[in-house]
């Protein structure tokens, strides 16, 4: 009876029931988890450095363009206050992100 049931399942699904066999994917290379920590940590460090520099460039350029549009040369006091705010914002942003300050 059990054998007939297994044959019925295999005819429908195309898979034969194999009791006691190892789990699917256990024999695939790279599935055991060994030797993956060193490569992933160096890769994540490099990725973090790229993300940090990219964010720094994006925020720096965006803020520069915003503050240049808002600041006017006719009002030097306003212009200097905006540049002071920009510097403080950049400093706080990169401290929060953990970016190295340059």
From Swiss-Prot:
Protein name, UniProt field: Putative uncharacterized protein YDR455C
Region (Disordered): 1-43
Organism annotation: Saccharomyces cerevisiae (strain ATCC 204508 / S288c) (Baker's yeast)
Composition bias, Low complexity: 25-43
Domain of life: Eukaryota
Biased composition annotated in UniProt, kind: Polar residues: 9-21
Further remarks about this protein from its record: Partially overlaps YDR456W.
């Amino acid at each position: 009876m059990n054998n007939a049931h297994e044959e019925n399942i295999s005819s429908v699904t195309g898979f034969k029931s194999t009791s006691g066999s190892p789990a699917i994917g256990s024999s695939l290379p790279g599935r055991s988890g060994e030797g993956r920590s060193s490569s992933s940590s160096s890769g994540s460090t490099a990725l973090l450095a790229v993300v940090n520099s990219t964010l720094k460039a994006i925020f720096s350029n965006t803020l520069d363009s915003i503050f240049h549009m808002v600041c006017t040369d006719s009002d030097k006091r306003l212009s200097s206050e905006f540049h002071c705010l920009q510097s403080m914002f950049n400093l706080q942003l990169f401290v929060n992100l953990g970016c190295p300050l340059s």
